[in-house]
């Protein structure tokens, strides 16, 4: 069954430059109106660094941002080192014993009747039945190391993906706050005209100014969060002035049930697979140490020279019995095996809990269709506000009624954006915990 791609979008896409410049201009205008003072050239010049910084910003696609973050975390170097370590570990486990060459001279004092010499070669033979277990143990350890590296890559991708959705949603929230600030500025202008006509009192102007102060504080707080996010993102990708591309998160991974999500996670979670590989490695270590207790056997072959012209050939075998040197190795390895098995089972239960909880949250947000304003409701709200503004300008609606209308519309938009953000975050967490890779589609500008 083909999977359906669902694009995450809300109220259109707006560039970071247009949002920031618009909000900065709105703040300056509102400051001028509320304090009844002229702005001055100094405040205007304050916009120049912001505009220049944004113009030079370089949007990064999700895939490129992940690659640069991998480099920043030195994961390519870790991968290269892991390759060398993997080769070295296998070479160490599969190496053959070095043969030893020996020379012996035997003679009796005060006589030449007994004078023997021999040249020979001695080879350790225990590698024949010990080498296989050593190689298997090394291979399992290599697998564990590879999964650990994959787990780091998955974690970095998840962090970058969260920055992408945070950046996009916070920009949309900033845009809505800027629009609301502008609407309140218009309300303040209308109120001044009504004050001159004697329709309302000066107290109503103060009420609007207090509401604008609240909006400006919310805007500044969100702007600070966005600045912190950009600073962190630029450190992640090791590139100054870089910003996340204005991308759409695709809902292209579907798990019909929590059980299917858990099954996918158990098969693909690199951190869990690393625990499993470590458990198998410790089991192979037990086999290896049991084989190490088998006596070491060496084969000796030599040519002997006897007194006179007599030559001879010597063949022999020697055995080293490990009475004390290997004691405790098997018991230690068996304890480590039990520990590895318990760690894997605990990690498996943890994965099951995490994925089931993440799936339930995502499923609830995905199936709840009545939790946010739709486009038709948003259009109705805007039409209602336009009518209310007209009534307010004619003195038919009170300041409180108009402010309540503005506040309700902003709250509805904010709740829609926050719900949208929660849905994206829940989806990302589910993909991360189930070891699935999220994908973004960057729209054409």
What are these regions (language model features)?
Residues 1-36:
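N-terminal secretory signal peptides that target proteins for export/translocation
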Residues 33, 415-445:
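Acidic, low-complexity, intrinsically disordered peripheral segments
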Residues 42-51:
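Bacterial N-terminal signal peptides
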Residues 55-105, 124-125, 133, 139, ...:
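Bacterial Sec-pathway N-terminal export signals of envelope proteins
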Residues 77-81, 94-95, 126-156, 203, ...:
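Sec/SRP-type N-terminal targeting helices
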Residues 99-137, 246-255, 296-332, 441-445:
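Small/polar, glycine/serine/threonine/aspartate-rich low-complexity segments that form flexible
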Residues 152-268, 358-365, 408-409, 416, ...:
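Periplasmic alpha-helical coiled-coil/stalk elements that build and connect Gram-negative outer-membrane
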Residues 195-199, 391-396, 433:
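A short glycine-centered flexible hinge/capping loop motif at secondary-structure junctions
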């Amino acid at each position: 069954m083909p999977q359906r791609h669902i694009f995450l979008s809300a109220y259109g896409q707006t560039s970071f430059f247009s949002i920031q410049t618009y909000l900065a201009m709105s703040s300056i205008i509102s400051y001028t109106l509320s304090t009844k003072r002229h702005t001055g050239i100094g405040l205007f010049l304050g916009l120049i660094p912001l505009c220049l910084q944004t113009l030079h910003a370089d949007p990064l696609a999700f895939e490129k941002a992940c690659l640069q973050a991998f480099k920043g975390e030195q994961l390519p170097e870790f991968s290269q080192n892991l390759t060398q370590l993997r080769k070295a570990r296998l070479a160490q486990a599969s190496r053959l014993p070095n043969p030893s060459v020996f020379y012996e001279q035997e003679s009796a004092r005060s006589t030449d009747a007994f004078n023997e010499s021999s040249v020979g070669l001695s080879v350790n033979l225990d590698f024949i039945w010990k080498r296989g277990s050593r190689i298997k143990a090394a291979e399992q350890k290599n697998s564990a190391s590879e999964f650990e590296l994959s787990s780091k890559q998955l974690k970095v991708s998840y962090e970058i993906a969260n920055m992408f959705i945070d950046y996009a949603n916070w920009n949309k929230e900033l845009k809505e706050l800027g629009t609301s600030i502008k609407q309140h500025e218009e309300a303040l202008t209308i109120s001044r005209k009504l004050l001159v006509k004697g329709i309302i009192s000066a107290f109503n102007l103060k009420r609007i100014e207090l509401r604008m102060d609240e909006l400006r504080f919310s805007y500044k707080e969100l702007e600070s969060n966005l600045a912190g996010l950009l600073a962190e993102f630029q450190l992640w990708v090791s590139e100054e002035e870089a910003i996340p591309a204005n991308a759409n998160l695709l809902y292209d991974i579907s798990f019909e049930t929590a059980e299917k999500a858990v099954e996918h996670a158990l098969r693909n979670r690199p951190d869990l697979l690393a625990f499993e590989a470590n458990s198998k490695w410790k089991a192979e270590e037990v086999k290896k140490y049991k084989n190490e207790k088998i006596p070491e056997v060496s084969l000796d072959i030599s040519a002997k020279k006897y007194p006179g012209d007599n030559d001879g050939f010597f063949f022999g075998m020697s055995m080293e019995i490990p009475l004390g040197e290997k004691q405790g190795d098997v018991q230690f390895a068996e304890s480590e095996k039990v520990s590895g098995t318990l760690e894997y089972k605990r990690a498996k239960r943890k994965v099951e809990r995490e994925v089931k909880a993440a799936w339930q949250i995502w499923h609830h947000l995905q199936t709840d269709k009545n939790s946010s304003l739709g486009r038709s409701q948003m259009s109705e709200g805007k039409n209602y506000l336009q009518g209310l503004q007209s009534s307010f300008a004619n003195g038919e609606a009170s300041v409180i009624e108009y402010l309540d209308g503005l506040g309700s519309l902003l709250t509805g938009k904010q709740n829609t954006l926050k719900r949208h953000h929660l849905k994206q975050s829940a989806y990302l967490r589910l993909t991360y915990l189930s070891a699935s890779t999220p994908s973004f589609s960057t729209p054409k500008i």
